[in-house]
Amino acid sequence: MTYGHQLTFGVLLDPDAARPGDGVLLDPDAARAGDSVERARLAEELGYDVVAIAEDPDGLDAWTLLSWVAARTGRVQLAAHTSVPPRDPAMLARSAAALDLLSAGRVDLTLTTGERAEAKGEAEAIEIIRGVLDADDPRPLTYRGEHYRIPRMQRGPLPAHRIPIQISGYAHSLLQIAGRTADGWVAELAVLGPDGVAAANKVIDEAARAAGRDPAEIRRTLIIDPGVSTDDLLPLIVEEGAGTLLVRSTDPTVLRRFVKDAIPALREAVGKTAGTVPGRSAAVRAKRRAGIDYDRVPASLAETAVEPGDVEYARVRNTYLRGGAPGLVLRPRTTAEVVDALGFVRAHPGVPFGLRSAGHGISGRSTNDGGIVVSVAALNGIEVLDEAKRLVRIGPGARWGDVAAALAPYGWALSSGDYGGVGVGGLATAGGVGWLAREHGLTIDHLRAVEMVLADGTVVRASADEHADLFWAVRGAGANFGVVTSFDFEVDEVGDVGFAQFVVGAEDPAALLVAWGQAIEAAPRDVSGQLILGPRRPGQPSFAQVMAVVDADQPDTIIDRLQPLAAVGPLYDQNVVLLPYAGIMANAAEGYHRAQGDPVARSGLIEHLTPEFAAAAARMLASGAVHWFQIRTVGGAVSDVPADATAYAHRSANFSVVAMGSDPRRVDAVWRDLYGYFDGMYLSFETDRSPDRLTDAFPPATLARLRELKRRYDPHHLLRDNFTIDPRGGQR
Amino acid sequence: MTDYGHDLQFGAFITPTAQPAHQAVELAVVADRAGLDLATFQDHPYQPRFHDTWTLLSYAAARTERIHLSGNVLNLPLRPPAPLARSLASLDVLSGGRVELGIGAGGFWDPIVAMGGRRLSPGESVAALEEGIEVIRQVWAVDRPGPVQVRGEYYQVVGAKRGPAPAHDINIWVGAYKPRMLALVGRAADGVLPSLGYLPGGAEDLAGINRHIDEAAGAAGRDPRAVRRLLNIGGRFAPTGRAFLDGPAEQWAEDLAGLALEYGVSAFILAADDAPTIERFAAEVAPATRQLVAEERTY
């Protein structure tokens, strides 16, 4: 029988075998060190899957050597054959996580017992290692075992992949551990013989079943001497289920011969019985959510899909602003895979569905509880299509900081929000209010064509000439109509820009707002920016943060433009720098999203910051219900585009206003007083999902047209995560 | 004026952040290419935001060519000395003699204990470090007869095989501030490695540090020049001078030359997590400081 594992081959760089008989040895350690590294590189070059390094009491430290080898190889799996003790399980886990991150997920651990025959603490060590690596669990790790005690340590870091932990040995106690909890079992063929392997497998399988596990969860690895014939190896694979063979040799000739003769013959002989991707363990499957047909995930997506029990889950469950617990995250890498993903979503009509580019969305949830998330993060290409026309093609999963960095060498920029961590897909289907908005318009105003997958799986190209109706809709309400898989933009020539950050006194926030609004409206279009206010804190001075970008590279011009902005209130601090646009966008936090909770954001678009509006805003700030109040500049080139040219229709506004809080009732109670001053809103900054908000986001004519298009392109209402337009809804 | 006459070294003190995974390695590569002498990483094994420092050092050593690497400083309470000695020797062999041992007695006991380590009083931790250094030196001393024999209060390593032999004499630099630890440095270490930011009296405290070390060295029959004085520093480059190590590179050089000539500091390790700062430290500050000190020393 086999256990269904993909057959892999490795090299065990065994210190005993490494004791070279050839060559002149001046410094045995140094020679052997170089030898091991060279053999590891050779093994990778020859196509071996695994390089295993065993502890050598007389030689180099195995972990140090493995770390070195990791840095000098790029593909091969790195197997540490090591013992606890002397290694401490918690420290070993930290080390394994580090090397796994550095080597992009190539580490696996095999616990050996050295001279000791019986198990002693290995089961506890496995629990501790797994506990440390489970960084998704926010609780500290506490462990009270017979061999180890950990009072209360922080878990993590999260490794790059699920690090397999295998057990090596022959004693019943070790086989039991292998069956009960380990991811694999490693044994030497020469010690056990084929009959011994069969007997050990039986013990492991029984222990696995007794623990409620499928014996196939445990990969069987045999260490073989190079002399063993293919005929002897074949039954070990097809009958005893060996999934990995580790050749114990450091002789290049032997390593080459095994690759040339044995591996192809073995692969061919077992081709029909082995070679599938191993399924998820019972422990992982136990965390699956109801209503999702996990076994029907399309083959093209299975390898990259993430479900709650996976290590990768911690990296994909939350977004920048929200905690989430989706039941499945599909991560297509191509348009065809997006088609497959939407097919899977269509087969789950009652299950929540979120679409994510980089997970920065406020209106678009892009995570959920128990539903499906399709993340297009892997569709992150940035490609110049036509240098003369400044035409670039960008994938929805790219982040704007990366886009800015990629365009900078050409002297180009695409105004696109103010934070480098925002993804292209969400912003470029909604609007895009950026640092150059007044001069160069919205991000969508630079869009020339998209490729998108519609709800029914059709792939279309939309532009002014093809599917012009969709092209209109995708610029402002794109999330309702499909998954854009690439955007063609015409970008601008932008040199260095002036970037100013002022701290101004806000004792009288209403006066400040009016003064700032007037200064902005009076400024030439090469000035865009924003103003941020927090709640008033009793007894403390009040400040506002004023930021501005001046698209000019002459310091005199920049200073000239900034003077009126610096004069809107008492200036407490200032910082003005001349830098490339990409330098402003290089502000994204690193690492995966760890947000918790659910924010409340309200958006409004407004033409002028009148004294009446400013007074209402000041009252709102004084209430304490809002902890973040931000006004961005639009107008200018944004207003040059006719209101009916795109689904983003509120073109007359000069300002985009956002308030954020945490309690929707408290926020709405104070937001109500501002609401009357607005002429619509920018949907990207709004969290309210009530259908009324649709009429704020889209004027009647726009909404009517969108609803008609929604009926045509998404009649079954598949796309409903971000300002959804119900195709069955009435004409508002 | 105290000057022990050491050649000047310049290094980077790089945060071993686990995210992005390669940031620390890439900065070590930058430091290597820029011509710095040392790339160092702090070691807080209880802090999961950081890479395991030993794994990072090993990986970074394999990605660099010339620069020496060290923990700054390795945490002895969570890194038992015999395996640590073997790891150091192994990396020294692999890297062609580019590893040094910055080590500390442990300072943050709560998280050390929370991870399963043993809480020691300040005095105990000094004694433990002295034993640890003894174990490490015995493991490295492959030419001495018999196995490792340390029957200490904190570490008992009896009968362990010596080796592997390091490729060069690995320096042992101790993070030390207080008299007992400084006395240990004077007796048994190759260098002292404090952080300027932790000196309550600023650079002037270095005089007291030197005095304790020199007295202990003398009492142990060692030449004070056997102990290198290293220093972790922080600063920022600015167009005009505002304060100590806050100004243009030329001012930095004068500030550092002052420390070298006044207090005998001969290794400056700059806390920096960005490539331009590391490159500027190497290209502008290091040569100018060396020149100033050389000019002064010729008088």
Predicted regions and their residues:
Chain A
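Active-site-adjacent structural elements that line small-molecule/cofactor binding pockets in enzymes
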Residues: 1-285, 511, 528-534, 539-564
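Soluble FAD-dependent oxygen oxidases
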Residues: 262-732
